[in-house]
Amino acid sequence: NPNKIIEDTDVRQMLGLADKTKLINLISYVFQGDEKKTINLLEDLIDSGLDAKNFLNDFLELLYLFGRRANLGPIEKDMFLSEAELELIEKSSQNLNMQDLSLFWQLTLKTIEDLKIVSSENIALEMFLLQLIHLKNLEDLSDEKVFGHKQIINDEIPKKKIENEN
């Protein structure tokens, strides 16, 4: 239709780009450990024509922004993000630490390499997100949750005073 106005969603679909708001929500679901919402949103993005490599590069960019937020406080104006997206990042990054973000960064880089050898990029993306969720869930397992009590570390073992009997 020559009279049809091209929308930003049309351009994103043609280029295989994801809506940043949806990506921020997806990362938030991963951080929350919500597999169902994560996979449903991924499927929605794939149905919209998502390109796996673009997705992972956008994911890296957002991890960087989450890390910047975690280390330096609220993000000031950013040319590539709307005010609503900045608010979403602010809200979603409340309890994040650099250790998690660094692990997510490394796994994202590895998955970009994996895309070169897998036959189904969509399955690779789904497995990538599930790995992130389970990695985060493992991180959240404290000794008390796993063992029912805090484990004693060598430094915490009470030391008996040894007196010299000379």
Outline where the language-model segments fall:
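Extended, largely alpha-helical regulatory/partner-binding modules appended to the mid-to-C-terminal parts
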Residues: 1-154
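Acidic, low-complexity intrinsically disordered tails
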Residues: 148-166
